[in-house]
Amino acid sequence: MDELLPYPFLALVGQPEMKTALVLALVNPRIGGVLLIGPYGVGKTTAVRALSDIMPNVEREERDDEGKPVLRRGPMRIVELPLNARLEDVVGGINERVALEQQRILLEDGVLAKAHRNLLYIDEINLLDARVVDAILDAAAQGRTFVRRGPMTRLYPSQFALIGSMNPEEGTLRPQILDRFGLRVWVAPLAEPQQRLEVYRRARAFHEDPEAFRERYADELYRLKLEVAAARELLPQVAISAAAEELAISSIQALKIPSHRAEIALLEAARARVAADNRLEVTIEDIVKIAPLALRQRRSLHLEGYAATIAIEDATIAEALAQLGTPAANGRAPRKRAGRAKAGETAKG
């Protein structure tokens, strides 16, 4: 099998939620990325790599042979982060060879610079160094990366669609990292025997003749690529109805979700869905469809308990003050201290 040829995205069996989330992330990077959660062997990495066939063309700044910046248009690329990546590999660092041979400091671009206007994929993100994860998520939120190494500094754009995947059997993510991902997908093993058999049949056909297998889906993939590009163009025109806004915020409050990233993810994903459907307004139905993807795993039982404890403690403090007869506790305004007379006024004695 030619490792350079990705498995066709439309040949994936089942997993409609995963496929929907990945396409929405291509349409609207402001969603905040997608986290795929599931055991080994269920197609997480295969699905992400399959996106290369439907990625739209984008403009990005590159360097010509003389080192001058030029704008070039081409398809988005998938930039994969190695599991053993160091912080310097990600944000950029000093070129050690140049430093040793030429006795000068040269800052090299990191993975985040290469990911600009592309898709950054992090497999097994729960096993990655925490500092590396923080740097990536900060760049994704701010759209730029600042590097300082000794006297050298550099600020470069790093706007990208972010996809992460993990196996929860190997450990979890910190809540503050989990919160940064806009959509969360549980990629469960296929339950239907016929579906599992179809996975085998398609995998075998792809292994035996990848080019012939891909040809079966070529026309549909091309149409999907055009639809993704059209949705990205339409997205700025998509508005949100007042009823949809009200339902989104009411749902988040009813679930007692503390993070304001919840409404960003929910509403931006709903806008992406509408653009993909070639519509111009988010409705209540869009919110209902997207809510599980955007709101799951956002509730914090710890914070709910903490807030309840604070409320009880505040009531206890107020009760203690009331028993002591304090003016504030009894509803009386505190007496003002007599001040000096203002200029031009006579103090009353």
Regions found by a protein language model. Name each.
Residues 56-58, 75, 169-170, 209-210, ...:
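Short, structured secondary-structure boundary patches
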Residues 133, 191-301:
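Basic, amphipathic alpha-helical bundle interface domains used for macromolecular binding and assembly
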Residues 1-196:
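Conserved ASCE/P-loop NTPase catalytic core
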Residues 104, 110, 154, 215, ...:
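Short leucine-rich amphipathic alpha-helices used at interfaces
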Residues 118-125, 161-168, 202-210, 224-231, ...:
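Noncatalytic linker/hinge segments flanking ATPase motor cores
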Residues 32, 36, 45-50, 113-114, ...:
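Short amphipathic alpha-helical patches
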Residues 40, 65-69, 108-109, 154, ...:
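Residue-level signal for alpha-helical context at structural boundaries
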Residues 41-46, 250-261, 272-349:
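C-terminal engagement/docking regions of AAA+ P-loop ATPases
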